[in-house]
Amino acid sequence: MGSRCLFCFADGFKGQRFKWARANNRSGAVLALEAASLLGDRVTKLYLYEPPFIINDSRKPVPADYVQQLNSLTEAGKRSEAVEYFVSEALGIPDEFIGYMKADPSWNKMKDLSHTLAYDGLIMGTTQSGKPLPTNRWVVNAPTLIMTGENSEPLFHDAAQALVKLLPKAAIHTLGGQDHSAVITAPEVLAKTVVDFEL
């Protein structure tokens, strides 16, 4: 699922230089950081929206055996249970709301993709463990804009503050009136920020 979260703009012929943007939720931020680390100077700018890192007690961390549990559920054919485990443990959705989610037609689509949820967990690695971010995982020298929504949960603001300390050319920009759903509800706001903001 994470591979859909990443897109690039070619800057020059033959895609020799890139501006990477994390355009969706979950592991897309990590994929963008990994790409920028691997491509080095070929990445000219990096844009991230609310990396969902859990680096303190602002939210319950994802269990250490999270990926193993997801795999066990999907291998047993318990696709709905796997999705429920994902939204509960990884997304932090309270139990009282999960029933409403199951009643939505999108739940069946999530069930069909439930075998990919473990990939997302593998990409996220230890970034949702409640511990500080690894200091040597990403070497990104490109100017980086980390966007957050004004009304988002504290964990997203804490994650942005932690990440900006690790990247030498990073800055945080808060989008007024937005929350974590802005990638769906206000994509034009994010797009304008990416276009207008100079790093």
Predicted region positions:
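Post-His helix in hydrolase/transferase enzymes
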Residues: 159, 183-198
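Conserved serine/cysteine hydrolase catalytic core
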Residues: 106-166, 171-177, 182
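Active-site loop/oxyanion-hole signature of alpha/beta-hydrolase fold enzymes
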Residues: 1-23, 27, 192
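Structured catalytic cores of enzymes that bind and process phosphorylated ligands/cofactors
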Residues: 1-2, 23, 30, 82, ...
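Short, well-ordered alpha-helices that flank and scaffold nucleotide-derived cofactor binding pockets
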Residues: 34-41, 165, 192, 196
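Alpha-helical elements of Rossmann-like donor-binding domains used by nucleotide-donor carbohydrate transfer enzymes
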Residues: 5-11, 69, 81, 85, ...
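Conserved hydrolase catalytic core segment
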Residues: 15-60
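Helix-rich cap/lid subdomain of alpha/beta-hydrolase
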Residues: 51, 55-108, 119-125
